[in-house]
Swiss-Prot record:
Protein name as annotated: DNA replication and repair protein RecF
GO BP, sorted A to Z: DNA replication; DNA synthesis involved in DNA repair; double-strand break repair; SOS response
The gene coding this protein: recF
NCBIfam families linked to this entry: recf
Location relative to the cell: Cytoplasm
Amino acid sequence: MPHLSNLKVQQFRNLGLVDITPSPTLNLVYGENGSGKTSLLEAISVLAHCRSFRTHKYRRLIQDTTTAFTVFATVEGSDAFKVGVQREWSGKSTAKLDGLSAKSSAQLATNLPVQIIDAHTFALLEGGSKARRKFFDWLVFHVKHEFKTAWANYVKCVKQRNSLLRHDKIAYSDLRPWDEQIAGLAATIDECRVECITPLIQAFKALMGECKFADNVDLTLAYQPGWKEGELSFPKQLEQAFARDRKLGYTILGPHKSDLKITANGSPAVEVLSRGQQKAVINALHIAEAQVYKTQIGRTPVFLLDDMPSELDANHIAILSGWLSNLGAQVFVTGVDANKLASVWPLQKNEAIKMFHVKQGEVTVSQ
């Protein structure tokens, strides 16, 4: 399975010069708050997305006394390659795969898939539909190659439709050509999503069967395409929504409004589950997604788990550890206390482990 065999980081946030050789399986990263633990995970995510999972303001990633940061890694596995990303203060971004300029950030994501679980992932339960679309579209993007083009074209068509809706004099006949295109693209997008989300839901249910609290809670995932499913076709619903769309100035129906409803005993899961149970559900969602990805693509994503020991009891951490081990994934886990991190994160059979200490931006191997 693909894994980072070497990681070099320069002038990134508060990190000093980093040059480490991670374990292909489990990597425990510990240090005080503010020491740079999360920054190390953030640097790895930049290699996968050409952007941070913590901020959209790239200048915050560059050390004050420098003009650019650089992150470089050697990735080993069935398809070995080298990847590097540099971002300058001016905004110029350079990304390379095996010395050649990457065509896009999507190419980086395809070559180095990464799953991130941190405090922000609670948005899957607490937030709006946008967070859940981002979650399941990660899988759709990687598995269904036609999705990316269909989605990009769909977004362009909806933007054009929204622009027309804001005109003072507009009749539905002016929108019909755009709605025909939107309907065709929506059908492709929906088909891609259904083919990915259906096995995702099945995998999630199987995983939750291993969590004791789930015996007393009826957890349900339900995909919603972004329009009402029933007798009326999506194009007809677009036409009927014209008056409301015109009043609002934007399109209220379509794949850009799709969702994955997560309920417990018929109510929103966030209203029923404890914080620890919510974290367990979120973990299961990410593992289920990785399982489907592995089944379809034959690889596993790298997992970045920030402050994982918090809000999870030893039993749930043991379950998560087993799930990750069964996947064969490379994992980076951060925590404050080394002993606690090592004690609550059980070592699986035949699993190599490395511990890294981060202190004032310096990353060293811990014996």
